[in-house]
């Protein structure tokens, strides 16, 4: 089910939603983000799927992704902040604390910008550094935000150690009722747009670890640009979520 404008405007400005609603021809909204007449429909469906996932404990396989979207403009292939909106929806529906765990290869700068200093939402991001969007580097953690920058070439072992040493204790200390995963698969060893070495088994492990952090877990697809491997990686993550 498509999200409503009111749900989207929990995060984004009405003026920005108007811009997306008014697109009449295909165009470059930014240097890396395309829009057109069907962008609003696709984006509202993506947000709606993310909201349904957080309500039911599902995995929303959506496009466009969302974790780079800013409150008043698109960025990095992202139109609306699917996960940030779903987290705000959960809080508005009576959940007291939501933790977002983002393992996309890129820092979730849009999500962080939305939720930073929101005491009801914790945000943890594991990402390649230095790398686009060149945010979330060393020294940027604080309050309700944990950034875990990892060097190019990091694989299953490095991700597992970082998750166990940094992400897990921080999220457990927050005591979330819901964990919402920004599940990007562009840290895979065969992804063409990055330089990490995570395998299908590594994503299965990350999903299983994430599922142990709260009574309810949901996930939303972010990046993943090798279309030949992406379906198998999503299946591996689903196996991890379901193993707990």
Feature names for model-found ranges:
Residues 1-244:
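HDAC/HDAC-like amidohydrolase catalytic core signature
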